[in-house]
A protein has these predicted regions:
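Bacterial N-terminal signal peptides that target proteins for export
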Residues: 1-11
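Conserved beta-strand hairpin/beta-sheet module of binuclear metal-dependent hydrolase folds
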Residues: 41-90, 200-213
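Divalent metal-coordination and catalytic microenvironments
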Residues: 50, 63, 73, 102, ...
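Active-site metal-binding motif and surrounding structural segment of the metallo-beta-lactamase
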Residues: 44, 66-67, 78-123, 172
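Metallo-beta-lactamase
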Residues: 27, 46, 69, 76-78, 94, 129-190, ...
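Accessory terminal helices/loops
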Residues: 16, 25-34, 140, 245-250, ...
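Bacterial N-terminal signal peptides
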Residues: 9-20
Length: 431
């Protein structure tokens, strides 16, 4: 591994333990190369005379007052230095406060750069628990993110302990916290959504609301493929209602560009809220009607007027996230109560079918019929009996490449790319 690759790996692993691909999804892009994630904003964007931002993997915002600056979110470790350089060139006043909308690494990565003697750092009280949760599973997430972003899989990490996170905030609050600096009032409210430590910031003087990740230009990641604690759909709904209750003239998300004008804010956030509410309610109705999660994943579709796009979050993942979040993993099938997986009997099925080549032929038939996902299931069965069976690996690669070619979701693309690389490696191909 050369020096550039090493630096790239270190930067991405640090960044991606808690980050995401949202910036690419919002631009309608699918990241095909890990280096694409490291593009740094190269200019300051003036939202108004007092509020400035720099875009990146996560945005950094500066609100300037006569008594000093307030920084809202600090981007990732990779972007933070450039963001700091650009914004301090704009205004060199002391940083009096740093406000963290939540504990993901693409919002907290620049705290050490912005923190000065006497700087107060504000977060919602659940920030402590959330940071400990992330640190507790740092090794797990490092492996997941390395897989998704084409990095070397790290060696197993030493467990740091249950409560080993570094806690930066000096002020923690429950529901609301307010302060005034240089005649500018800042009202901070709890807004659980993407995380349970999430907050938003209302600046009434400018009728501006910093919304963190309550809203972005895609259906939300109610479940994220890297794994996460439950994200509650109704938390999103309630927090979006709270955003709109301020009647803001400008909403400033931590990913993407501001939404300007109360009418446009109301239109977009109402559509977003109603889309989430619709999916949640349809899942709950289906659960109460006795439908299983796969039936609901197949049946539930957004009405055209609520279609907010699926470039980042995806409907079927959110449906399953809502379902499993409410009731967990037991599906009423007694076999799932025990510690023997379905895959453990796949070799018996393969033997009965006449060997893995026979299953591979069936997978190819499914591909020809247009069902690449069913083909993947069949290759799972075949490869459980013989992990090096070439015809099964070739069928698997063909199915994956079909899914890859039609993929329009950034997170989905990352995992398809990972599986393509792994399958090619098993076939002895370079990638």
């Amino acid at each position: 591994m050369n020096r550039h690759s090493t630096l790239l790996s270190l930067a991405l692993l640090t960044l991606l333990v808690t980050g995401n691909l949202l910036v690419f999804a919002q631009q309608g892009l699918v990241a095909n190369n890990p280096a694409e994630l490291l593009r740094v904003g190269d200019k300051v964007i003036k939202i108004n005379d007092a509020i400035s931002m720099v875009q990146g993997f996560g945005n950094t915002f500066m609100v300037s007052t006569s008594e000093g600056n307030v920084i809202i979110d600090t981007s990732s470790v990779f972007h933070a230095r450039k963001h700091h350089e650009l914004l301090t060139a704009e205004n060199k006043s002391p940083v009096r406060y740093i406000i963290l909308t939540h504990g993901h690494g693409d919002h907290t990565g620049g705290v050490p750069l912005w923190k000065e003697a006497g700087t107060q750092i504000i977060a919602q009280k659940h920030h402590v628990d959330f940071m400990n949760y992330q640190t507790r599973l740092a090794g797990f997430y490092a492996k997941r993110n390395a897989a998704q972003f084409a990095l070397n899989i790290p060696e197993p990490a030493r467990w740091a302990g249950n409560y080993a996170a570094k806690i930066e905030p000096t002020i923690l609050f429950d529901d609301k916290y307010e302060f005034t600096l240089g005649g500018v009032k800042f009202e901070i409210c709890s807004a659980p959504s993407e995380t349970y430590d999430h907050l938003m910031v209302w600046v009434p003087k400018y009728k501006a609301l910093f919304s963190g990740d309550v809203y972005y230009e895609s259906f939300p990641n109610i479940y994220t493929l890297r794994g996460t604690q439950p994200r509650w759909a109704l938390d999103y709904v309630n927090s979006l209602n709270k955003v709109m209750s301020f009647n803001p003239e400008i909403v400033i998300p931590s990913h993407g560009m501001p939404i300007r004008g109360n009418a446009e804010v109301t239109r977009r956030l109402t559509q977003y809220r109603d889309a989430i509410q619709y999916v949640h309610d349809e899942v709950v109705k289906g659960m109460n009607a006795g439908k299983d999660v796969y039936t609901l994943m197949h049946e539930i579709k957004l009405p055209a007027n609520l279609d907010v796009g699926e470039s980042y979050g995806k409907l079927i993942w959110s449906i399953r996230g809502i379902y499993d979040g409410y009731v967990g993993w037991f599906d009423m099938d007694p076999v799932t109560m025990y510690d023997t997986s379905a895959a453990s009997v796949y070799p018996d099925v393969v033997k009965l079918a006449g060997g893995p080549d026979a299953i591979a032929r069936l997978a190819l038939q499914r591909i020809e019929a247009g069902d690449a996902v069913a083909a993947l299931h069949l290759t799972d069965i075949a490869l459980a009996a013989d992990s090096s069976n070439r015809s099964s690996l070739e069928a698997r690669l063909k199915a994956l490449e079909i899914l890859q070619a039609r993929c329009k979701n950034t997170n989905e693309r990352g995992w398809l790319d990972y599986s393509v690389r792994a399958t090619k490696a098993s076939l002895g191909e370079k990638h």
